[in-house]
A protein has these predicted regions:
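Surface-exposed, charge/polar-rich loops and edge strands
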Residues: 1-427
Length: 427
């Protein structure tokens, strides 16, 4: 069963939150962070992407960069741009899609998801109560571990899902009917972000006790952050001769959402060539395993599982997997990412390793089908393949079976904003 606790968050004053908050470190590169921070000295990018304070081209792994993060984190607190709450509490973080002309997702405009910001147990990560569905890379783990170690804090939360729970739904609905502590629309994604404080002892007790009845939590997004936080916590426990188990380093910050509320977008593929085939030869080869239907020049989106959308030569096609070619009892093999990788990318195009092959690139669904069309029409890519989104049920089934999702399979949106709450490991 899941162990969570309240904590004394470090966060910006209400009037500074829009200057401090940022996108998460791993969705943009150094130059994008430099551009977004601009001349805003209060931007969290100075802590989570501190290479922006050095000349262009400075490696994010330079030891001076880690030192700068520590210096800036301390300075933000000294200047009052970040302040620690006086008492332990939980937080409720709401994200609403399509609150502005700047943002919005097809079919999801106005949808809100409500997450509980908690301190999750390192022990739960180690013993499998917190379930994973992705492999992590050691180099990325090491980078995040350094940030956690040197700052002695979880600067950014991890994104968890949990099976829907009526008690938590009711508590969240009641508290979010009041005025939030933060309420703003992010300039980049155009989504609305709100935060409430959960201070009442009864409510805190209800959250803690209800999570203790939930058998598993699922990492939706942030596998490297989860691994780094848990490994640093375990390190600190080992190094402390008086370790008790209730120290703050035994926990790491997560935002937990009911599984049914989450939005998973398509994660699409663009490929540079047809492996020596002409357009006609490629379409003929596809017809062996798919019913191929020409749809025309207007962008066409797959309508169901096992249907794919192909853009080739200025034309969109529907590719429907023929009956009997998917084993629905196989949680991995029946995924559309697995089917497309095996029957199209590997067998026809000769792309064996999605992580390393330079002939393929990936486009998150937030960019829309227009981005696929653009990259083919400008000659950069030869074809694009759009997939139907993976469901949260599929992800949970794979995690429950102890399996790992294929690479580039999930794209959760909205992303959590960073800088709304920070968790210190020594309190």
């Amino acid at each position: 069963m899941a162990v969570v606790k309240p904590f004394r968050g470090i966060r910006p004053p209400k009037d500074l939150v829009e200057q401090v908050e940022s996108r998460p470190y791993d969705v943009l590169d150094s130059e994008e962070a430099r551009a977004e921070a601009g001349d805003n000295e209060k931007s969290l990018y100075h802590i989570i992407k501190p290479e922006i304070d050095f000349p262009v081209g400075t490696s994010e792994y330079d030891p001076r960069v880690y030192d700068k993060a520590v210096e800036n984190f301390k300075m933000f607190q000294e200047k009052g741009w970040l302040k620690q709450d006086a008492e332990e509490m939980y937080y409720i973080y709401a994200q609403t899609i399509g609150e502005s002309p700047l943002g919005g997702l097809q079919g999801a405009s106005g949808k809100t998801q409500y997450g509980l910001v908690v301190a999750a147990a390192v022990e739960d990560y180690m013993n499998g109560v917190i379930k994973k569905h992705e492999l992590t890379r050691r180099d990325k783990e090491e980078d995040r571990m350094k940030h956690v170690r040197v700052n002695n804090a979880n600067l950014e939360p991890v994104f968890f899902a949990y099976p829907d729970n009526a008690v938590l739904d009711a508590l969240v609905a009641r508290i979010t009917s009041t005025v939030p502590e933060y309420d703003f629309i992010a300039p980049v994604d155009g989504f609305r972000h709100q935060l409430w404080l959960v201070k009442e002892p009864e409510d805190i007790c209800t959250i803690t006790e209800t999570f203790a009845t939930i058998p598993y939590l699922y990492i939706a997004d942030g596998h490297h952050r989860s691994a780094a936080a848990a490994l640093v916590g375990a390190e600190k426990a080992k190094q402390n001769p008086n370790h008790r188990g209730d120290e703050e380093y035994n926990f790491f910050m997560a935002v937990c959402f009911p599984a049914s509320q989450l939005t998973i977008l398509d994660y699409n593929r663009v490929v540079k060539d047809l492996n020596g085939m002409t357009d006609e030869q490629f379409l003929d080869a596809l017809a062996k395993n798919f019913d191929v239907t020409k749809k025309g020049a207007e962008p066409y989106r797959p309508a169901a599982l096992h249907e794919f959308s192909l853009y080739l030569g200025g034309v969109w096609y529907s590719l429907k997997l023929k009956d009997g070619l998917s084993d629905e009892t196989d949680p991995i093999g029946s995924l559309d990412v697995s089917i497309s990788s095996k029957l199209i990318l590997d067998e026809l195009l000769g792309i064996k390793d999605l992580r390393s092959d330079k002939r393929i690139d990936f486009v998150g669904g937030l960019r829309g089908l227009g981005e696929l069309k653009r990259r083919v029409d400008n000659g950069e890519m030869k074809m694009a393949l759009a997939l139907y989104p993976v469901s949260m049920t599929q992800i949970m089934n794979i995690a429950d079976s102890g399996n790992i999702m294929p690479p580039k399979a999930t794209w959760f949106e909205p992303k959590l904003r960073s800088g709304l709450v920070i968790h210190k490991l020594d309190d």
